[in-house]
């Protein structure tokens, strides 16, 4: 069984607060999730309902049979573009390491995302007093000045998808951290400016038959 400590980092909190503990187990290809609220969280914020599939009371709660991860973690998960990047990275690593490709679960996607650019207000730790997962300086968000390189990488990945082949690892490595946390199907990545302000950069797609970005700018 795998576990994560879940912290809320809402803008109205003075500091991140422990919400509870998320557990994950896969038995014979079937995923099961459990969650237990922190007593301190329930004491201070018991009137705040975070998810319609979790009740605000102490003790372990589980997802219904056949249901995926609890609803309020869904916003923190990558969508089609992010999952494509993470899946292709796993396929390339499996090929390089001469092993079968692992089946990735929502738990794997959750822990595969960079902390700074993760969508939503939840952050995760593997140990209560440890660092937030994927908060290392190595997993940096690229600057705006890298935008042309990121566009080239996204184009190469889309091209490989069209041709039903694996992309080169260098393209995946360039986009998997800044791009895997974002929702939607279009190629995109997180970037920061010189003031460390986070932006979402949407890229042209090989499938576009008009300038989608131009029209989104004015819509």
Tell what function each PLM region has:
Residues 1-219:
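Phosphate/dinucleotide-binding and metal-coordinating scaffold of catalytic cores
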């Amino acid at each position: 069984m795998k576990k994560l400590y879940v912290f809320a980092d809402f803008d109205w909190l003075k500091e991140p607060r422990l919400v509870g503990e998320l557990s994950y187990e896969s038995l014979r290809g079937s995923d099961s999730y459990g969650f237990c609220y922190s007593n301190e969280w329930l004491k201070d914020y018991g009137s705040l309902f975070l998810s319609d599939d979790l009740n605000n009371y102490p003790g372990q709660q589980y997802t219904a049979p056949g249901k995926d991860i609890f609803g309020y973690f869904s916003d923190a998960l990558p969508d089609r573009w992010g999952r494509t990047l993470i899946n292709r990275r796993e396929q390339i690593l499996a090929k390089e390491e001469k092993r079968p490709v692992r089946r990735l679960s929502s738990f794997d996607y959750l822990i595969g995302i960079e902390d700074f650019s993760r969508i939503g207000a939840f952050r995760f730790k593997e140990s209560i007093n440890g660092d937030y997962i994927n908060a290392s300086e190595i997993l940096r968000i690229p600057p705006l000045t890298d935008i042309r390189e990121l566009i080239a990488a996204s184009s190469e990945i889309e091209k490989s998808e069209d041709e039903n082949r694996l992309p080169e690892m260098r393209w995946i490595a360039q986009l998997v951290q800044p791009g895997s946390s974002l929702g939607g199907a279009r190629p995109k990545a997180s970037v920061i400016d010189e003031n460390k302000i986070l932006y979402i950069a949407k890229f042209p797609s090989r499938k576009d038959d008009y300038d989608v970005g131009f029209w989104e700018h004015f819509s």
